[in-house]
């Protein structure tokens, strides 16, 4: 029978062997963890060094821009790179290391830093308008021909630019007495140096955004009608003897009036201008080609009202002439 003292010695030796085994495994794992940690710290130190150099370079660039009068702050201040690892149980001398990705908070902070460091000029494309000589000449000619000062032209020339495009946009404001249906919008007429064309013309309109590229001038249709009542009344009478050009111009006038449901009895007479002729001819062509007259016609026939007014004027003139003759005979 084995004595108890020998059993104690054998147990002690076995415990020492187990302790030595675990000590060896733990020391090996510490060496592996130490090397991994050192590599991680080396990587972070390189990243910090690159960030420091980039900050120095960007600071010099910002100083140069400040000297030139361009203030912009684009310093990089990203959060610390977060790489952590967790070791599993040691099995057969192998150590598995898991790297965690950055958390949501760190990602959000990094994105906020990137958005703050962006150049605000890249985020908004702002083009300062530059007035052109073409727009100034056009407004001057318009004011001279029509005979009245167009309000807001000085501020309009400062706030709108044509970007070297020799085309400008005229927005036609119809009189308040005209009730235009909702499905028909007012026409924007593009003015060139030599002719005028409609914005909706597919042959002369390479871009649908010509209105944003040119200068916009407000033209009141009521003023054009007021300035040309005599021309209208004379040319609507077919029996009067006028030249072909004047008669053609009267037809253009009538085409417009037939499409506008308004009473022109309150229009005052004035002289005719070349600019008004150009506008009226352009609107007439637009009405012939693009707008159906039935959609704009009213229950009251404008032609009939004009002819009635002409007959009333003639009757008054006849009555006055008869009265004068009777006075002379007496």
From Swiss-Prot:
Q: Which domain of life is it from?
A: Viruses
Q: What is its main location?
A: membrane
* Localisation per UniProt entry: Membrane
GO CC aspect terms = membrane
The record lists the membrane-crossing segments as: 2-22
Enumerate the glycosylated residues.
Answer: 72, 94, 234, 315
Give disulfide pairs as residue numbers: none
Keyword Transmembrane in annotation: yes
**Topology within the bilayer:** Single-pass membrane protein
Ordered alphabetically, the record's keywords are:
Glycoprotein, Membrane, Transmembrane, Transmembrane helix
Q: What is this protein called?
A: Uncharacterized protein L487
Organism in which the protein naturally occurs: Acanthamoeba polyphaga mimivirus (APMV)
């Amino acid at each position: 029978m084995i004595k108890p003292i020998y059993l104690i010695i054998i147990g002690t030796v076995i415990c020492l062997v187990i302790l030595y085994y675990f000590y060896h495994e733990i020391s090996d794992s510490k060496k592996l963890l130490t090397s991994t940690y050192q590599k991680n710290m080396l990587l972070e130190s390189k990243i910090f060094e690159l960030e420091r150099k980039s900050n120095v370079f960007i600071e010099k660039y910002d100083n140069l821009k400040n000297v030139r009068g361009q203030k912009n702050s684009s310093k990089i201040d990203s959060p610390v790179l977060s790489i952590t690892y967790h070791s599993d149980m040691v099995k057969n001398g192998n150590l598995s290391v898991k790297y965690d990705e950055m958390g949501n908070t760190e990602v959000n902070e990094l994105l906020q830093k990137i958005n703050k460091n962006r150049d605000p000029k890249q985020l908004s494309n702002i083009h300062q308008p530059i007035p052109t000589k073409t727009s100034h000449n056009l407004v001057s000619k318009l004011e001279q021909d029509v005979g009245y000062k167009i309000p807001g032209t000085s501020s309009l020339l400062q706030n709108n630019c044509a970007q070297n495009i020799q085309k400008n946009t005229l927005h036609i404001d119809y009189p308040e007495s005209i009730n235009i249906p909702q499905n028909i919008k007012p026409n924007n007429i593009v003015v060139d140096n030599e002719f005028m064309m409609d914005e909706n013309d597919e042959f002369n309109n390479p871009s649908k955004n010509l209105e944003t590229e040119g200068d916009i001038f407000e033209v009141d249709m009521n003023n054009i009608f007021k300035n040309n009542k005599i021309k209208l009344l004379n040319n609507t009478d077919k029996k009067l003897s006028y030249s072909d050009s004047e008669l053609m111009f009267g037809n253009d006038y009538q085409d417009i009036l037939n499409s506008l449901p308004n009473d022109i009895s309150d229009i005052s007479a004035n002289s005719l201008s070349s600019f008004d002729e150009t506008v009226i001819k352009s609107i007439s062509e637009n009405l012939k080609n693009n707008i159906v007259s039935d959609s704009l016609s009213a229950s009251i026939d404008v032609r009939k009202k004009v002819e009635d007014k002409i007959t009333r004027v003639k009757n008054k003139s006849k009555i006055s002439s008869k009265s004068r003759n009777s006075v002379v005979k007496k």
